[in-house]
Amino acid sequence: MTRIFGTDGVRGLANGQLTAELALDLSVAAARVLADRGEFKGHRPLAVVGRDTRISGQFLEHAVVAGLASAGVDVLRLRVLPTPAVAYLTEALGADLGVVISASHNPMPDNGIKFLARGGHKLDDAVEKLIEQHLAEEWDRPVGGDVGRVTPYATPVEEYVAHLVGTLTRSLDGIKVVLDCAHGAAYEAGPRALRAAGAEVVAIAVEPDGLNINADCGSTHLAALQAAVVEHGADVGFALDGDADRCLAVDHEGNAVDGDQILAILALGMAETGHLAKNTVVATVMSNLGFVQAMRAAGVGVRQTKVGDRYVLEAMRVSGYSLGGEQSGHVIMSEHATTGDGILTALHVLQRMAATGQSLQSLASVVTRLPQVLVNVPDVDKSRADDDAVLAAAIAEEEAALGDSGRVLLRPSGTEQLVRVMVEAATQEEAVSVAGRLADVVKRQLAL
């Protein structure tokens, strides 16, 4: 059967590919699979459900809750809450299942459903495949007192904020911050957490109306944040995405600071305090070569994985690493979280600034980025990207010419019908030239 789950749960156009019926069926199937695996043995099963601010999240939440309750699962409704907050409360409340209704940084018309296992971790691929296999199957429905109870949870934001602030060891007093919440799930928790930690906060994009999530704001559109940091004379700015599982930054002059630089700042700070497990940071193959070189020069090891925060987290869990992340701003600090957490990331970058007395610009300068060009090639057969001999030969030829001063990465998208061509080189012109040539080969060889 066609896969429904992508690299980050189920995503699609709300009320298009992702309907209320599918949301209900997925929830029932998830409950059945976990029950068959013995996850609910000896107790009434419990799930927590949260969502972002998209207008479609309301009907999808009702469908998910209905599916779970009809399968005999008690449900705590967390309402609008960041993805990492749902993950935290899944663990803190001892829930058997967490459900996040969000399409993260995607445009407003999209939405998604992501399931979290007990402990707040994303479900394994194998479990997601079982859920797909059980979709719309006939089953013995619970009746009477065996159906699930649905209860609004009273204090999700308060408990999450207390958890975040509790991870810090010093006050952020005296630091002025602009925080862009993307009109998304962190519009309440984000400013509250930074203020509770002592920072002076100017909050922008905190007026969600169901339609404006990620619209010209947040981590995918930094211009508003850059302007606000300069306008308010702030020390630093942070941009979250719609579900607040990622964070990018802006220094006091309005210059963007990406996930690689943020990861480097945190890695060096954790290494200094003895909290960087195995003195190694986990990144993906998309991380800039300049980041890898900076870490190795500082004596910090780098373990690289496939693209996707789930693969970063998998490497961290299997090998016992404490820090990992992506260039896009997903940062996982496993001592404090089970998934990427944008607010947590911002707090710990601010703590590093407070501890060193250095500006974000100074801290980020440890990474000298190589020029990087990313070209998305749409409407091609991405399934053939790894098997085409002509394309492989073209990549090998370009890599040989780049030598140690650059690299090529070709990657099929996990969520869209396109292939990404990434090139790093000694100069921007060379990177653009190589990426353009390879994009042309991709279009020609992988044409539909």
Swiss-Prot record:
Recorded catalytic activity of this chain's protein: alpha-D-glucosamine 1-phosphate = D-glucosamine 6-phosphate
Enzyme category, top tier: isomerase
Modified positions (Phosphoserine) in chain numbering: 104
Location of the active site: 104 (phosphoserine intermediate)
GO cellular component: cytosol
Pfam families linked: PGM_PMM_I, PGM_PMM_II, PGM_PMM_III, PGM_PMM_IV
The record's account of how the chain is modified after translation: Activated by phosphorylation.
Textual note on the cofactor: Binds 1 Mg(2+) ion per subunit.
UniProt keywords, alphabetically: Isomerase, Magnesium, Metal-binding, Phosphoprotein
SUPFAM superfamilies: Phosphoglucomutase, C-terminal domain, Phosphoglucomutase, first 3 domains
Gene Ontology molecular functions: magnesium ion binding; phosphoglucosamine mutase activity; phosphomannomutase activity
EC identifiers of the protein: 5.4.2.10
GO biological process: carbohydrate metabolic process; peptidoglycan biosynthetic process; UDP-N-acetylglucosamine biosynthetic process
Residue sites binding Mg(2+) per the record: 104, 241, 243, 245
First and last residue of the signal peptide: none
Required cofactor names: Mg(2+)
Record's keyword annotation contains Lyase: no
Top-level taxon of origin: Bacteria
Its job: Catalyzes the conversion of glucosamine-6-phosphate to glucosamine-1-phosphate.
Family: Belongs to the phosphohexose mutase family.
Protein name in the entry: Phosphoglucosamine mutase
